[in-house]
Regions:
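Tandem CBS (Cystathionine beta-synthase) repeat/Bateman regulatory domains
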Residues: 1-300
C-alpha cells in the first residue's frame, strides 16, 4: 500500500493506491465446493470467474453461494451456474472518488482493476481496501488519536467521528431456534452480511455470517437446523461513543468486518458498524480532514 503524505487530500488518491493486488481467479467449470474452499483459504468475499481462454466472465460472491445453499443446489455444481455477469471493472489510474461512485451506482461492493494500457487485470478494489487506506492516512496524520498527537476528552481540539455517527442504526436479530433457511431469507431481504442471534430473553448470544453459512453448505449441514448450532460466539461489540479510529483498529486487529454496537450495556445492541459503513463516509476519522472528503452527488 502506498505511503501517504499527510499534506495530500483524499480527493487526490487513485485506485492503484488502495487496490488489492492479489486477484483470485477460478475456471467457471470448477465446483461450488472448490470455490468455498478457496474463499475460506484466502479470506476473501468473492472470486473472479474465467472461461477456458482465461477471459473474465463473472463473479461469485458469498452471497451467491448462500443463494445456492438456500436453493438446494448440489455442491458439486459448477461455479458458472451461480456466477453474476458481467464482472465490473475500473482502471488503475482512475480516481478513488470515481471508483466509489461507480460502486455506489452499481450497488456492488467490489470492482476489478484493469491496466489501461495492456488491459490486464492488476487488482481488486473493495470497501475494506478503502478503509485500510483511510486508516493509514489517519495514522500518519499529526492529529491522529492513536499517535497521541492530541489529548482525548474535553481537551481535544479536534472533533472526531464516533461510531454513533457512522454506524447503521437498524439491527435485525434472529432467534436462537430459527432455522438456517430463515437466516438466509432475512440476510437476503435486508442485504446484511451477518445476523445477530438472540436467546429466549432477546439478549445477544452469537452471530451468523455468510462465511458460517458457506462452511455449513460445504459440510452438508441441513439448512433446517437451528441457528444456534452454527453461530459464532461471543459477539464482537463496541460502545456507541467509541472513536471511529479506535473501532477500525479493533476490527483490523481481530480481522473482522463488523462490530455490533452497544449503548452502556453490551446486551443493549443499538446498531452495527461495518467496514463498508466506515468507507462510505469518504473521509478520515476526524473533522481535521473534512475539507478533503471525496465529493459525491447531493443525493448520495
Amino acid at each position: 500500500m502506498a505511503q501517504i503524505n499527510r499534506k495530500n487530500t483524499l480527493r487526490n488518491l487513485g485506485v492503484s493506491e488502495a487496490m488489492r493486488r492479489q486477484v483470485i481467479q477460478l475456471d467457471q467449470v470448477k465446483s461450488i465446493d472448490h470455490g468455498i474452499t478457496v474463499l475460506i483459504k484466502y479470506k476473501i468475499n468473492a472470486l473472479l470467474i474465467v472461461d477456458s481462454r482465461g477471459q473474465s466472465v463473472g463473479v461469485v460472491s458469498k452471497t451467491d453461494i448462500m443463494g445456492a445453499y438456500y436453493a438446494g443446489l448440489p455442491i458439486e455444481s459448477p461455479l458458472e451456474h451461480i456466477m453474476v455477469t458481467p464482472p465490473l471493472f475500473c482502471y488503475s489510474g482512475d480516481s478513488l472518488e470515481a471508483a466509489l461512485e461507480q460502486m455506489r451506482e452499481s450497488g456492488v461492493y467490489r470492482l476489478y482493476v484493469m491496466d489501461k494500457g495492456e488491459g490486464d487485470i492488476v487488482g481488486a478494489l473493495a470497501y475494506p481496501d478503502i478503509v485500510g487506506l483511510l486508516y493509514q492516512y489517519c495514522h500518519q496524520c499529526e492529529y491522529s488519536h492513536l499517535q497521541g498527537g492530541t489529548r482525548s476528552g474535553q481537551d481535544d481540539p479536534v472533533r472526531r467521528f464516533t461510531v454513533r455517527e457512522v454506524m447503521t442504526a437498524s439491527v435485525k436479530g434472529i432467534g436462537l431456534n430459527e432455522t438456517l433457511n430463515t437466516v438466509m431469507e432475512t440476510l437476503s431481504a435486508y442485504r446484511f452480511g451477518a445476523m445477530l442471534v438472540t436467546d429466549a430473553k432477546g439478549l445477544p448470544c452469537g452471530v451468523i455470517s455468510k462465511t458460517d453459512l458457506a462452511l455449513s453448505y460445504r459440510h452438508g449441514v441441513d439448512p433446517e437446523v437451528e441457528a444456534g448450532t452454527v453461530m459464532s460466539s461471543p459477539v464482537s461489540t463496541c460502545d456507541v461513543g467509541l472513536l471511529l479510529e479506535e473501532a477500525i483498529k479493533k476490527m483490523t486487529i481481530a480481522d473482522i468486518h463488523r462490530l455490533f454496537v452497544h449503548k452502556v450495556n453490551p446486551d443493549n445492541i443499538v446498531g452495527v458498524l461495518s467496514l463498508t459503513d466506515a468507507a462510505r463516509i469518504r473521509s478520515g476519522s476526524c473533522y481535521a480532514c473534512v475539507s478533503s472528503r471525496i465529493k459525491v452527488n447531493d443525493h448520495d
